[in-house]
Amino acid sequence: MTEKTCPCGDGKSFDACCGPYLSRASVPVTAEALMRSRYTAFVRQDISYLRTTLWPKNLRGFDEVATAKWAAENHWTGLTVLDVQKGGAADREGTVLFEARYLSGGKLNTHRECSRFRKKAGNWYYVEALAH
């Protein structure tokens, strides 16, 4: 992966992929695009984007300092999308199963999660991690 390649693993350049979302120039039109952009936000330590794309009712429990610390302490090495259920441009809800790989304390780890997303007023939001 080069600096110009988007960290989300979609194969596009950052400017043609998640860059417009993180700069707030546009919004993701699918749940998968939002999930990929949130992964990229972790890689780039853009905690305000993570907060902005969190389901509004869950904002109270969001710990910005702890999230920033965790993002900074880990070196993100890759993302693999395993499954997508709904979450298209015409949907209001969807789920994305993924694996995010990262180095922490010299050890390679894999975070596997099935994320639930919901769309409100044309914007997708991360709601929660589901049991999988």
Describe each model-derived feature in a short phrase:
Residues 1-37:
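Short, low-complexity N-terminal intrinsically disordered segments enriched in polar/charged residues
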Residues 12, 21, 100, 115, ...:
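A short beta-strand motif that forms part of the nucleic acid-binding face
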Residues 17, 50, 117:
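Hydrophobic pocket/interface hotspot
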Residues 38-49:
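Short helix-adjacent coil turns
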Residues 50-52, 127:
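Short, hydrophobic secondary-structure boundary micro-motifs
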Residues 52-81:
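Short solvent-exposed beta->alpha transition segments
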Residues 70-110:
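Surface-exposed, charged secondary-structure patches
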Residues 110-132:
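Short beta-strand edge/turn micro-motifs at domain boundaries
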